[in-house]
Structure formats: structure tokens, C-alpha cells
Amino acid sequence: MPGADKEVDLTERIEAFLSDLKRGGSGTGPLRGSSETARETTALLRRITAQARWSSAGDLMEIIRKEGRRLIAAQPSETTVGNMIRRVLKIIREEYARSRGSSEEADQQESLHKLLTSGGLSEENFRQHFAALRANVIEAINELLTELEGTTDNIAMQALEHIHSNEVIMTVGRSRTVEAFLKDAARKRKFHVIVAECAPFCQGHKMATSLSTAGIETTVIADAAIFAVMSRVNKVIIGTQTVLANGGLRAVNGTHTLALAAKHHSTPLIVCAPMFKLSPQFPNEEDTFHKFVSPHEVLPFTEGEILSKVNVHCPVFDYVPPELITLFISNIGGHAPSYIYRLMSELYHPEDHEL
């Protein structure tokens, strides 16, 4: 039976992706390509839409929520997975509304009176069957995948608006988006990049090697020297793992130190973050916010005498509050941290914030 074969194939692909997520999370450093994770998640959701058994938008949303909860549980710190699931749920809502001939925008911008008097959009609204819905949803997911393919390039294209000749730029660790951003600017501008090494993972060394290979004047500094060097810096440009609902960041360890130093010296702090990193999560959600790894890089196991007397924690991420950030550069342009809530409402439906 071809239907049964499809279901077995789909289950195998979901399980393979789950094990990939788990393995990625147990790595030594925080650098797992978020853009690859976003594309893989979206491609898997497209396959679920195409191959799973469902007859209405409500059924499909229930399947995607169920599988989504499993994917998020496999690696809670990888917020990109949850973000793409919410984007696809929004797509399904929009395509269903289009099939019915109504506008999803009207539903989202309901007045306060309507929200209080009605129970909101119930799942009953998604039970109507439309023959073309599957094809329409798949087409919309394909458009999302195309958008994801070009996110880094779209951010890099804006580099010349922000980086000027003979500037001193500081960054921390290694972000592929920031790397592409700086390399794009280097085609027409001469500038100097200072990279904080980002111990204990020391991804900054890889970043510096990559930039110097591209002909950019680069200096690596220890994390402890950030404040001392900041007075000479014109701009700080960083990447992030997640942009939170309040406009804050969950970024690689050491970013908060950098942001505080930049604030003290009134140095602009620019964050390069594609739209798929926007998450409806808040910094008080402790269980998914923090991620700790083995501290053997900080305190080797050979230090036997000290090891028995201390507890060592090695967090992967820092929280950076929105008041320390000057500007976000996403694949659709530049935004102030206070504008994040608006982007969030455009990307995700309020009912999908909790899967």
C-alpha cells in the first residue's frame, strides 16, 4: 500500500530529524547553524503537510502541533524549530481564511470589545474541507523556504549602509551572518575588526581566521580586554541565537559584557538577526532559556584537588536586555528593539505562542 509506505517514510524522517536535534544539542559549542535548522524544520513540515492524513486545516494544525511539541522537546534551547512551526501554523490559518474568502488580518486586529465578548477563534472554524488547501499550503511553505535561503544575503546587502571607511568594528565569537555582513562591506570599504575570542569555546579565533583570509584587518582579544579596548571602537556588530519577545537577546556567552561596555562608552550596538530568530519566548522561561555544557574547558579534570571543593557551571548563553541594543538588522530591514512586538504579531498568530 503506497499510503502506508508514505507514512512509514514520514515517521522515519521525523525520527531522524529528532536524533539530529538531540545530537546537535550535546555538542561542545553553541554554533549549530540556525539557518540549516530552520530550513530542515520547514522542509520536514512541508513533507508532513504533503504526506500525512488530514482532511481539514484543523486536522493538519493538530498534527503539526503534536509533532512540533516532540521536536521542541528534543532540543528546547534551539528556538528556531518552534519559530518555524509557528510560521507554518500561521500559513495554514492564512490559506484557510483565503479559501473561505475571509481575511486573516481582520481576525487578528479584532477590537478589545470583540475579544472580551467572543471566545476568540475556535478550532471549529478550521473544520471545513477545501480540496485545494493542501496544494496552497505547500506552495506557501515553498515561498517560506525561498525566503529562508536568502536571509543571510539580504542582511549582508545592507552592510554598506552601516559600515564606513576606517571604522573600528568589534564583534564576539563567530556568527555566520555577521561574517557575511563584514565580508560584504569589505568589498568596498577598508576597516578594522576586533574579535573577542569568546572563551571557553573560542569561536572568535575561527571568525578572525575567516575574516583575515578575506583581506580584512583583524585583531583577536581576550574577553577580559573588551572594556579596555571599547573606547577605540566605532560600532559593535553581533549575531544572536534568539531574539526574544521583549526585544532582548539570548546570545553567546560574553555578549552581555560586550553590550554593557558598549553602553558605557555610548558605542552603537547592532544585531544582525534574520526573522526566523524572532521568538515569542520571554527571558523568564527558565527551563528553555538556559543551557549548560561541560566545564572541562574552564576547569580541566586534571585539577583534581580543586574539583572536589567547587561546583563549576558553564552556561552557553547570555541574556542581553533590549535597552542595551541600538538596532536590529533583519532580512527585511533595520528595526529598533521597541518594534519587535509588531514584527512578532506579523509572523505568528497569538494562539500559536504556546504550542
Swiss-Prot record:
What name does the UniProt record give this protein? Translation initiation factor eIF2B subunit beta
> What quaternary arrangement does the UniProt entry report?
Component of the translation initiation factor 2B (eIF2B) complex which is a heterodecamer of two sets of five different subunits: alpha, beta, gamma, delta and epsilon. Subunits alpha, beta and delta comprise a regulatory subcomplex and subunits epsilon and gamma comprise a catalytic subcomplex. Within the complex, the hexameric regulatory complex resides at the center, with the two heterodimeric catalytic subcomplexes bound on opposite sides.
InterPro entries on file: eIF2B_beta_subunit, IF-2B-related, IF_2B-like_C, NagB/RpiA_transferase-like
Listed under GO biological process in this entry are: central nervous system development; cytoplasmic translational initiation; myelination; oligodendrocyte development; T cell receptor signaling pathway; translational initiation
**What Gene3D superfamilies does the record tag this protein with?**
Translation initiation factor eif-2b, domain 2 (3.40.50.10470)
Q: Name where it's found.
A: Cytoplasm, Cytosol
Gene Ontology cellular component list: cytoplasm; cytosol; eukaryotic translation initiation factor 2B complex
**Of which family is this protein a member?**
Belongs to the eIF-2B alpha/beta/delta subunits family.
Q: Which gene encodes it?
A: eif2b2
Q: Which residues cross the membrane?
A: none
This protein's record includes keyword Cytoplasm: yes
